[in-house]
């Protein structure tokens, strides 16, 4: 997945689900 736990719970400014890279 590109979001959630693998992304460290990161989210984009658009309130979208982002990857661990921040996009």
From Swiss-Prot:
It holds the Pfam family Chitin_bind_1. It catalyses: Random endo-hydrolysis of N-acetyl-beta-D-glucosaminide (1->4)-beta-linkages in chitin and chitodextrins. Induction: By infection with the fungal pathogen Ascochyta pisi. GO terms for biological process: chitin catabolic process; defense response; polysaccharide catabolic process. InterPro entries: Chitin-bd_1 (IPR001002), Endochitinase-like_sf (IPR036861). Its EC number is 3.2.1.14. GO terms for molecular function: chitin binding; endochitinase activity. It is an enzyme of class 3 (hydrolase). Keywords: Carbohydrate metabolism, Chitin degradation, Chitin-binding, Glycosidase, Hydrolase, Plant defense, Polysaccharide degradation. Disulfide bonds: none annotated. Defense against chitin-containing fungal pathogens. Belongs to the glycosyl hydrolase 19 family. Chitinase class I subfamily. This is Endochitinase B.
């Amino acid at each position: 997945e590109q979001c959630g736990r693998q992304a460290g719970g990161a989210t984009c400014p658009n309130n979208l689900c982002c990857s661990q890279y921040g996009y």
